[in-house]
Amino acid sequence: MKSACLIILASLVVCNLTLARGQGIPAEEETGDRQTIDDIILQRAESLLLRSILKNIGDEDGANEGLTSQPEWLVKRQHPGKRYQEELEKRQHPGKREEDEDEDYDEVQKRQHPGKREDEFDSFVELQRRQHPGKRLILEQITENPAFLSELSKRQHPGKRYVMYYSKRQHPGRREVDDESDAGDLRELEKRQHPGKRYLDNTSPDLGANSPCDVLDPGCSKANLLLQLLDNVNKSRAEKRQHPGKRSAPVEDLTEQE
């Protein structure tokens, strides 16, 4: 580009000189003043032309240098820990990028204010919503997370903890697998309840067809309920004192032994 511009300038200078000499052929005495003025004008025109061409060349070079130096300027303004992140992701293995994202998320959690950290329970619920109902986490994996269990116990009612929560989240075909764990949860629920209120549950076998009255029956009096509670307590104590092979004896034999 520069060589072409120099060639053009040289050709222009040669043309101007030949024209000036061709016009200066008449007598010098008559046209002496005019030749000097023409020479001055030509020199000024040539100088202006050279300056304009050199200025254009300098502007083009400055623009090219600015484009090449822009990444360096951008790198200087960036944080030292964030430089070359895109290049690093391109060079990494595709299977290792997700691990780096998890590490970055943990680092963000550490740098956040304790009062502004995301709730683990809310994130777990969001994960459950995005998963397929048949592919959600199994009950054993949930119970291994103490933070999730503590958060769940804080939000639930004391008498209703761990009873119906898992059955709602599990697949309908897998609810029967956890019947034993549900039985353990019911025992834990009975331990936490008041002793006088354990037998007021409609689903208990003690309030079956042999019960003197139903709890929901308006004709059932408090005296009958108290008698029923006393009979149940005496029956349980008698069964504890008996031999394991004789616990199936009728109620009359139990009363005679007492």
Swiss-Prot record:
It holds the Pfam family TRH. Residues 84-124, 166-215, 236-258 are annotated as: Disordered. It comes from Oncorhynchus nerka. The modification Proline amide is found at P80, P94, P114, P133, P158, P172, P195, P244. This is Pro-thyrotropin-releasing hormone-A. Residues 1-22 form the signal peptide. It is found in: Secreted. The modification Pyrrolidone carboxylic acid is found at Q78, Q92, Q112, Q131, Q156, Q170, Q193, Q242. Its main location: secreted. It comes from the Eukaryota. One of its GO terms (biological process) is positive regulation of insulin secretion. Functions as a regulator of the biosynthesis of TSH in the anterior pituitary gland and as a neurotransmitter/ neuromodulator in the central and peripheral nervous systems. Belongs to the TRH family. Keywords: Amidation, Cleavage on pair of basic residues, Hormone, Pyrrolidone carboxylic acid, Repeat, Secreted, Signal. Transmembrane segments: none annotated. PANTHER family: PRO-THYROTROPIN-RELEASING HORMONE (PTHR17530:SF2). GO terms for cellular component: extracellular region; secretory granule. InterPro entries: TRH.
